[in-house]
Amino acid sequence: MAELLAIKWDDNRDKLILLDQTILPNKIEYIEYDTAEGVYDSIKDMIVRGAPAIGVTAAYGLYFAAKVAPEDKFENFFKYLKEKSSYLDSSRPTAVNLSWALKVMESKALENKDKDVKEIKSILREEAKRIHEEDIEICKTIGENLITLLKDGVGILTHCNAGQLATSKYGTATSPMYLAKEKGWNFKVYSDETRPRLQGSTLTALELYEAGIDVTTITDNMAAMVMSQGKIDAVIVGCDRIAANGDTANKIGTMGVSILAKYFGIPMYIAAPTPSIDINTKTGEDIPIEERNPEEVTSRFGVWTAPKGVKVYNPGFDVTPHENITAIVTEKGIVYPPFKENLKKLFEK
């Protein structure tokens, strides 16, 4: 079984290589990119998806923009860079890692404003690679922290894809699953199908199956049943943005899963790289929620599944109230309620 990586970097050819996640699980194909415009399209069209992976991809996209930026003086170079940063940031408004990575790249350019512009371009190349490598380490550490909350024989429910395909490697929510397999644990994963784009069945189930992990796909409306049957000991999901009070935006349907978990007394864990925590966003009400193409709901695989012309509401995300969350697990440690106080402490370390 082959290891599936969402993001690859070809250092010799200066190209970003992305797994086309829109055609999984039927085809495994990679697409090469070397322009900011191409990277924008890859994020907008969900060739690449998942907040950490989007952030890494955007960093490379801004480097590609820097490559063709004016070189006469820093002011002109940085003006162009800022314009392209705003352009890339508009591709997916909910994932905070996107704006975080772009700000890191902008700051790196400003730190080196007294250097030759050609040298700054090389520095930005290395910074994008550093963000990529850091994401791998973050994901592994999140897994190491999460696995301390689990035990051999555990039954896990996950929603959408916060796996290796949503990050540079390991995933966030799936990281403890890969580590548990390495330890030889006997455990079972239930993967919500995740309507309407089916990331749970086409992505999470695929990557776990390819890794030899015991995974079972269920439709979203089966989650209550498997919980009631005692098959689930923990719910682990990723996130796209966490507000200062712990409210968490994640793929549509996550809030419903959290309500079920609370009802059945099952712990709900959020796997979260610290770049996904937005201390400047006070509550979930302040998180922008992307609305997507209605045809994601009304048609699938070229077949209409609803009357043509029917009204459709298709938010890509919902917000899980902090009251429903047992713990937020980051690379810096496990955060328990009260989240408003304890999340802030992460950034004081």
Swiss-Prot record:
GO terms for molecular function: S-methyl-5-thioribose-1-phosphate isomerase activity. Pfam families: IF-2B (PF01008). It comes from Clostridium botulinum (strain Hall / ATCC 3502 / NCTC 13319 / Type A). It comes from the Bacteria. Its EC number is 5.3.1.-. NCBIfam families: eIF-2B_rel (TIGR00524), PRK05720.1 (NF004326), salvage_mtnA (TIGR00512). Catalyzes the isomerization of 5-deoxy-alpha-D-ribose 1-phosphate to 5-deoxy-D-ribulose 1-phosphate, as part of a 5-deoxyribose salvage pathway that recycles this toxic radical SAM enzyme by-product to mainstream metabolites. The record marks C160 as: Transition state stabilizer. Pathway: Carbohydrate degradation. Keywords: Carbohydrate metabolism, Isomerase. GO terms for biological process: L-methionine salvage from methylthioadenosine; pentose catabolic process. PANTHER family: METHYLTHIORIBOSE-1-PHOSPHATE ISOMERASE. This is 5-deoxyribose 1-phosphate isomerase. The keyword Ion transport does not apply. The lineage of its organism: Bacteria, Bacillati, Bacillota, Clostridia, Eubacteriales. Gene3D superfamilies: translation initiation factor eif-2b, domain 1, Translation initiation factor eif-2b, domain 2. Substrate binds at R49, G50, A51, R92, Q199, N250, K251. The keyword Isomerase applies.
